[in-house]
């Protein structure tokens, strides 16, 4: 027994071993006193002292936290309501109970916790602990309090893998000045509408080929077997035009072996990442079966990304054209090394393929379930064609109000990222409580987007709520909160403009060519790192006459 205790104690010390190599990164290390014992984060921290030896009075009420207007008294952090948990593991064991909360339904957990505890609550799940905000106004205050280097919680398994392998952390997981340097270079190319729209013609050609492929792969019922995988192929082919300005080979009768390998490993990557995000990071002590799977998928994805970058690197140095694809732009800019560019390209391919395909399948599902919305979109496209002598460019398709509204409404109902977050840089008041610097704060997007006090008829599909022509008087704070699915501020999703352009073009072209219907049991969301359907989405694609 004594030997076992010694082993457990040693293991926990290793898990919480300080990270002395990253002194500029703000890490969420704010424990809260529960049941007389401080809840300890198992994240690598910058505290040289073992947390087990620290006083349980690590955090006390902070007197210099700024109060919100109208607040008469700010409550201490320890009084934030939330589910009771055990020392060290918090509520982790609850998630393994048959009738307990599930990691695959974390978005529903946030929603139900908010109904139980209110617009602000605290929970510790294993090594992951955070304050969850369900008020647009309160989270808006956090957004406006950001500094030059906003700190977002790193995706620990990815960061740990890359550090172990000696790879660049990438713009997604890096922090501080290093993040800012890379972000500044890339955002000039990726977040300007004018830059992204330069590739609308190529993306339109990809969408045309995708529509042809859908016609080819329809079964006898008019359905697309493995629609989600077909959307993976389309998203990968489309992002390739922006990253490399070349076709990868996903949409032919035979998908290229490289594309098949990448897609298969990408699916495995996200499925293994999800459980690693919340469980105790035991993979830092020994290589678990799940970690080995994640590592293998990551190795393969990195290898493909590296090969694509190396293939384009030297030819790019010869290019001097104005509308450079991303790698050419980065090579000619000269601010990032090959290693950094590889990390960035892999991040973009991972995010672009999974995010865009998941969002698009939800859009198609909503259109198939709501023929009246589908018809309005078709009429809008038809009228726009009539005004342009029967033709309409991919760039013009991106400007159609209804297709934009359909995408916004879909992401409200099925936010692919069910939460967005920050590690706050300084003590502040949120929801009437003192929140210490370094605390991880998340916005409960899924819960807010389905709150009837914020969005009337929240379970329905009402794209009209986003149309200015309807005289919508949506509150400015609520409207801005609705876009948090793409992140916010300086750390907004780099691929947002590209993903929106891809979806606007492709959805319009699909509705131009097909009538969609869905005649099966309702699809429910499930969490595979992102919000994805819990079953194959069997939509009937009926060619229009």
Curated annotation (Swiss-Prot):
SUPFAM superfamilies: Cytochrome P450
Gene Ontology MF annotations: heme binding; iron ion binding; monooxygenase activity; oxidoreductase activity, acting on paired donors, with incorporation or reduction of molecular oxygen
Expressed in which tissues: Abundantly expressed in the female gonadotropic hormone producing dorsal bodies.
Record's keyword annotation contains tRNA-binding: no
E.C. number(s) listed in UniProt: 1.14.-.-
Xref: Pfam families: p450
Record key words, sorted: Heme, Iron, Metal-binding, Monooxygenase, Oxidoreductase
Keyword hit for Ligase: no
UniProt binding sites for heme: 493
Superkingdom classification of source: Eukaryota
Intrachain S-S bonds: none
Cofactor entry: heme
Top EC class, one word: oxidoreductase
Gene3D superfamilies tied to this protein: Cytochrome P450
Family label: Belongs to the cytochrome P450 family.
UniProt function note: May be involved in the synthesis of the female gonadotropic hormone produced by the dorsal bodies.
Name of protein: Cytochrome P450 10
Taxonomic lineage of the native organism: Eukaryota, Metazoa, Spiralia, Lophotrochozoa, Mollusca
